[in-house]
Amino acid sequence: MEYSDVPKFIRDVSIKQHEWMRESIKLIASENITSLAVREACATDFMHRYAEGLPGKRLYQGCKYIDEVETLCIELSKELFKAEHANVQPTSGVVANLAVFFAETKPGDKLMALSVPDGGHISHWKVSAAGIRGLKVINHPFDPEEMNIDADAMVKKILEEKPKLILFGGSLFPFPHPVADAYEAAQEVGAKIAYDGAHVLGLIAGKQFQDPLREGAEYLMGSTHKTFFGPQGGVILTTKENADKIDSHVFPGVVSNHHLHHKAGLAIALAEMLEFGEAYAKQVIKNAKALAQALYERGFNVLCEHKDFTESHQVIIDIESSPDIEFSASELAKMYEEANIILNKNLLPWDDVNNSDNPSGIRLGTQECTRLGMKEKEMEEIAEFMKRIAIDKEKPEKVREDVKEFAKEYSTIHYSFDEGDGFKYLRFY
């Protein structure tokens, strides 16, 4: 390939990506789609610029307008989450977690968090952010039948182990975690409580999930691009008392420049969430429950039927124990992709953490299809597409044609100030 051909190659591949997504059912629980206004903001001159430090206290010149943008982000974040302090500079949820780990612990301290098979994010584990800080990770007691932390056993373990930091939240997250149950024990042993809300930040913002800052958490960290429908990035909400400490551990601790164009997009997404977040989050959870019920009725072993399956955006399926399914979770994930149904295989609590290539489960999320206008009726259709492949054993390429026709009807962004085409390719030249 000639160097001069690279721009055209990238444009062609990008257009293919847009069209593929237009014709696909998108069920990855850690993704979402932004509004056109957010995209426009992310494509501004801010992408070329650099800023270190806080608004009004920059180490670089030329920041007067990004100061306005970031100040607005901070104020809207505080309003949305009813927080005393917000830092919007983390470039991801993992970076937000790392900043809190550095602010509140020292090497050798104990961190209490979910194990990865029980739903903990990899950044909670010794191989990632927790290990970078040199923390000793102890795991929350977990009840796989309830798909949640065992609150009584957790309190006992806090009193016995005396962790420095107690972390809630995770990647497999169908139900609120027992934050309030941990508060008294945490106070007794001198532990701080932090909540990784990366997956459920949009549901918290929409007032449809738990409110960790009111339940005893001093920190709420999160990604701004999962159930929260902004550009990729991270945020930390905390108290006034923690403000200087966390700000200094974000910069210069773990962030230098903080992707200024994404802050412009984030400001718009925050405004959208303040305006539309409650209705959006309600529908996300309604859709998750409807999808879970429809799959369960079609022979999938959807976990926690006795609890109405889920209280979040996530639907968890144990493929290995679904009697009518002869494929593995890994095989099915690939087959669904061939049919333009995009989802992921996932470890479940009874899986070996080292067997992530061949886990028992599949994880689904309803946040993106909700933003594209789908409701409960469409969840029935999605479940039927999934059944045709997993149980009826139809060829993925045959199902794909029906999926494409279905998905193309849902390409308009909802819950935004500009209900435009979510998959239109925007050209600059």
From Swiss-Prot:
<dbReference type="GO" id="GO:0035999">
    <property type="term" value="P:tetrahydrofolate interconversion"/>
</dbReference>
<dbReference type="InterPro" id="IPR001085">
    <property type="entry name" value="Ser_HO-MeTrfase"/>
</dbReference>
<comment type="pathway">
    <text>Amino-acid biosynthesis; glycine biosynthesis; glycine from L-serine: step 1/1.</text>
</comment>
<dbReference type="GO" id="GO:0008732">
    <property type="term" value="F:L-allo-threonine aldolase activity"/>
</dbReference>
<keyword id="KW-0808">Transferase</keyword>
<dbReference type="GO" id="GO:0030170">
    <property type="term" value="F:pyridoxal phosphate binding"/>
</dbReference>
<feature type="modified residue" description="N6-(pyridoxal phosphate)lysine">
    <location>
        <position position="226"/>
    </location>
</feature>
<dbReference type="InterPro" id="IPR015421">
    <property type="entry name" value="PyrdxlP-dep_Trfase_major"/>
</dbReference>
<keyword id="KW-0554">One-carbon metabolism</keyword>
<protein>
    <recommendedName>
        <fullName>Serine hydroxymethyltransferase</fullName>
        <ecNumber>2.1.2.-</ecNumber>
        <ecNumber>4.1.2.49</ecNumber>
    </recommendedName>
</protein>
<dbReference type="InterPro" id="IPR039429">
    <property type="entry name" value="SHMT-like_dom"/>
</dbReference>
<dbReference type="GO" id="GO:0046653">
    <property type="term" value="P:tetrahydrofolate metabolic process"/>
</dbReference>
<feature type="binding site">
    <location>
        <begin position="120"/>
        <end position="122"/>
    </location>
    <ligand>
        <name>(6S)-5,6,7,8-tetrahydrofolate</name>
    </ligand>
</feature>
<keyword id="KW-0963">Cytoplasm</keyword>
<dbReference type="InterPro" id="IPR049943">
    <property type="entry name" value="Ser_HO-MeTrfase-like"/>
</dbReference>
<dbReference type="InterPro" id="IPR015424">
    <property type="entry name" value="PyrdxlP-dep_Trfase"/>
</dbReference>
<dbReference type="GO" id="GO:0005737">
    <property type="term" value="C:cytoplasm"/>
</dbReference>
<dbReference type="Pfam" id="PF00464">
    <property type="entry name" value="SHMT"/>
</dbReference>
<keyword id="KW-0663">Pyridoxal phosphate</keyword>
<comment type="function">
    <text>Catalyzes the reversible interconversion of serine and glycine with tetrahydromethanopterin (H4MPT) serving as the one-carbon carrier. The use of tetrahydrofolate (THF or H4PteGlu) as the pteridine substrate is 450-fold less efficient than that of H4MPT. Also exhibits a pteridine-independent aldolase activity toward beta-hydroxyamino acids, producing glycine and aldehydes, via a retro-aldol mechanism. Thus, is able to catalyze the cleavage of L-allo-threonine and L-threo-beta-phenylserine.</text>
</comment>
<feature type="site" description="Plays an important role in substrate specificity">
    <location>
        <position position="225"/>
    </location>
</feature>
<keyword id="KW-0456">Lyase</keyword>
<dbReference type="GO" id="GO:0004372">
    <property type="term" value="F:glycine hydroxymethyltransferase activity"/>
</dbReference>
<comment type="similarity">
    <text>Belongs to the SHMT family.</text>
</comment>
<dbReference type="InterPro" id="IPR019798">
    <property type="entry name" value="Ser_HO-MeTrfase_PLP_BS"/>
</dbReference>
<dbReference type="GO" id="GO:0019264">
    <property type="term" value="P:glycine biosynthetic process from serine"/>
</dbReference>
<dbReference type="InterPro" id="IPR015422">
    <property type="entry name" value="PyrdxlP-dep_Trfase_small"/>
</dbReference>
<comment type="subunit">
    <text>Homodimer.</text>
</comment>
<keyword id="KW-0028">Amino-acid biosynthesis</keyword>
